[in-house]
Amino acid sequence: MIKEAIFHKSDVPYAYPLNENQLKIVLRTAVFDVDRVYVLYKDRYDWLGKFKIKPMVLTHTNELFDYYETTLELNKKFVYFFYLVSDGGEKLYYTEAGFYKKRPENHFWGFFHYPYIGEKDVFFAPEWTSDCMVYQIFPERFNNGDKSNDPENVKPWGEKPTADSFFGGDLQGIIDKIDYLKDLGINAIYLTPIFLSHSTHKYDTTDYYTIDPHFGDTQKARELVQKCHDNGIKVIFDAVFNHCGYDFFAFQDVIKNGKKSKYWDWFNIYEWPIKTHPKPSYEAFADTVWRMPKLMTKNPEVQKYLLEVAEYWIKEVDIDGWRLDVANEIDHHFWRKFREVVKAAKPEAIIVGEVWHDASPWLRGDQFDSVMNYPFRNAVVDFFAKRKISASRFNTMITEQLMRHMDSVNRVMFNLIGSHDTERFLTLANGMVARMKLALVFQFTFVGIPYIYYGDEVGMVGDYDPDCRRCMIWEEEKQNKSIFNFYKKLISIRRENEELKYGSFCTLYAIGRVFAFKREYKGKSIIVVLNNSSKQEVIFLNEVEGKEDILKMKELKRSGNLLYLQPNSAYILK
């Protein structure tokens, strides 16, 4: 056995409570290296009792590792345990202290321990997220519902955008399209920032308590949220707490008064008088973006101000959560306080961080509920849009993502294929709709929350920002109805099948450009098969007999467990 690959730690994601009496544990081994794994466990203070023994199940395999899992049923809230690992010949006992050829006895402090399951150690996402499908709106480009609040020099709707061009999108425009959103089938919207700012994107906030007048006002925001709620749609606002805008009152006071300003310590000022060029004389977003001075969230006064903002909009207009911009550049201490404030104001509010990389430090149950899942997007773009990786590599990428987090976190990850900060998926796929449809099937059948960037559902294209922020296409003759109807079908399939919302995930086939997996829940299963190639493929899969394709994207020919897959095809077998 390759001992160097065998790994466990009594912490997330290798050990975590599902409730006060169940502990999920995971053991990693080298791929194809082990044939049996058992866990031996008992209550930590049951000095005379015997160890219980339980076999573990191989749940995930990738190019490097196998992962074995089980759930321990506990009589008490504390447990200690160790593993028995076998490759058919050699047997090893694996403990926190290392490996043993003989079963260790009287080894209390050498075993793996989960000392106590506290009530707050159990992570539960907001209940409504289990059936959630999110639609992101960039308000300035979604719909112009009130021309009376348009900015000066507004551009004609549909003209190609620049970094600073305005088109007049507003909150009334979103209200006017609630029926459209309801017809599509989504049940949550996330709005990029809507607070006072001079920019089109509003990520340089001037006033956190004022809706930008080109979008509307507080009453209009309240109306939007209420009408969304009336139609079964949750509303998530965007919080930009890493930095403010150059015109933010506190920064302007520093510009005017220097060290005499009571807000001096709200920022990290290198030199005064303030300079913006050639490089800002203060810490700013991305080091050089002078319009966005970084806020010092270690400062108790800054914390108090921002936490009051977060609470205010929940209470004032009844929003259902916050998406947190540049969340990975703010200290964890602040986010723990943020969670306490938000959950006290509205326990079912969702907290979603913007983290482009491994977000596990923020997803332990004490900070965020979810993040925008850019690693998911990376894998989907590479496999489906660009076709530059194999199914085996794709499986490794998504398996690694699943194994970073608790199951309850994976189920609420915002699985996006594009956003206001990325190229449109259809652009990356060189306009090949077939590739996009395959990606969508995976997105809507994988573990997590499907996330739609406005306009993707009608076939919008666009390169990197600002081109990805084009005006929404409302002329039906210009919309791709094939893509739109495909979205609607996938949304319906996901909503009607519990396996896709709650089920476990297991890869069944990952060879060449064919990928197949199973979602299973309460004894029922759905098998998804994706042929991400331009030629017919023939594969053998167990468990497919008796199952019918509910997607009906392309004809499926079969002979027992042999499947004849059409080029660029997907099948959802139930």
Curated annotation (Swiss-Prot):
Pfam families: Alpha-amylase (PF00128), Alpha-amylase_N (PF02903). Its cofactor is Ca(2+). Changing residue 325 to N: Loss of activity. It catalyses: cyclomaltodextrin + H2O = linear maltodextrin. GO terms for molecular function: cyclomaltodextrinase activity; metal ion binding. Keywords: Calcium, Glycosidase, Hydrolase, Metal-binding. The keyword Thylakoid does not apply. Gene3D superfamilies: Glycosidases, Golgi alpha-mannosidase II, Immunoglobulins, Oligo-1,6-glucosidase, Domain 2. GO terms for biological process: carbohydrate metabolic process. It comes from the Bacteria. Its EC number is 3.2.1.54. The record marks 421 as: Transition state stabilizer. The active site is at 325 (nucleophile), 354 (proton donor). Binds 1 Ca(2+) ion per subunit. InterPro entries: Glyco_hydro_13_cat_dom (IPR006047), Glyco_hydro_13_lg-like_dom (IPR004185), Glyco_hydro_b (IPR013780), Glycoside_hydrolase_SF (IPR017853), Ig-like_fold (IPR013783), Ig_E-set (IPR014756), O16G_dom_2 (IPR045857). Ca(2+) binds at residues 144, 146, 149-150, 168, 170. The keyword Disulfide bond does not apply. It is an enzyme of class 3 (hydrolase). Monomer. Belongs to the glycosyl hydrolase 13 family. Hydrolyzes cyclodextrins. Can also act on linear maltodextrins, with the exception of maltose. This is Cyclomaltodextrinase. It comes from Thermoanaerobacter pseudethanolicus (strain ATCC 33223 / 39E).
